[in-house]
């Protein structure tokens, strides 16, 4: 049954006004968090952006795997994940298949000719995705919500589950309001027939797609609970004490996904980076850690592989088991073996070729920004 767009809009507004995080105009974090550059850091940050010599893009092609053959068989353990790049993943958990933050566009940008460009093609065309039980969208930034991807998914009858307010974008792009479920923090919805429960949980971030809609919609992390497995998808966030609340509510996790890339010390409190990702993992209490939000777009000033190298060097001393699949590789966390450092092969090829960067069809400067846009 379709739902009137006007009725959906009115119901959304009513729910937003009832949210303790909405002040009548914008959504706010629970704790004070700065999304922009910290005071006194503008000029040093700009100098670093202009003069820094970091390898901000990979110096050789990133290896990809095609997951379609794997998807034809159910995961033997009941839990499998396929990282398609950045924060786009396919979860297969206890009979449900869920796509997160679908981005297939060439640039994480409002325009097709400028802005952060992909390091690699998506491992699989969006038209070749398998049947999905849900599309899960954390917030409305361009590197997490791609209009062309949503439009490509319109013909499917898949549910779209997202943060409060984000449904307005989906409706504008042709998604039937009846297919959209918007959640405020701690609200949940159940997928049928699997019974997998998805709960929106806190994150410390911000939202907006233009200069005029900053924080007009909400942002979330998510807890996925199946009959046998539990997954935490951190999406975009800074370090927040609310991770302890999440652990207290849900207990142990089989798999934890946390962002490690596109961070900078001057960027306030809205991204983790590798060290804070380990702190967040400790607060969450358990679970194999799959690092996301790196290796696809140049959204910061660090070397493209610095986040994963830092994480992999620190994780053993923190007792954290990492899962680092190749892009497109369908893996079951219960069967994780040794670290799979595929990014070092890229670095070795870069050194062998003598190239400092490999950026097809764009210049170095076109792919980076000196302030947080995601």
PLM region spans:
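Cap/insert and terminal regions of metallo-dependent hydrolase folds
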Residues: 2-30, 118, 125-126, 134, ...
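Active-site-proximal loop/helix segment associated with metal-binding centers of metalloenzymes
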Residues: 48, 52, 104, 200-226, ...
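Divalent metal-coordination and catalytic microenvironments
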Residues: 91, 101, 139, 146, ...
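Di-metal (Zn2+ and/or Mg2+/Mn2+) metal-binding site signature of metallo-dependent hydrolases
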Residues: 123-154, 164
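Catalytic core of the metallo-beta-lactamase
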Residues: 88-94, 190-253, 268-276
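Metallo-beta-lactamase
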Residues: 1-128, 163-235, 254-260, 310-328, ...
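Short hydrophobic/aromatic-enriched beta-strand-loop microsegments
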Residues: 100-101, 159-161, 177-185, 254-259
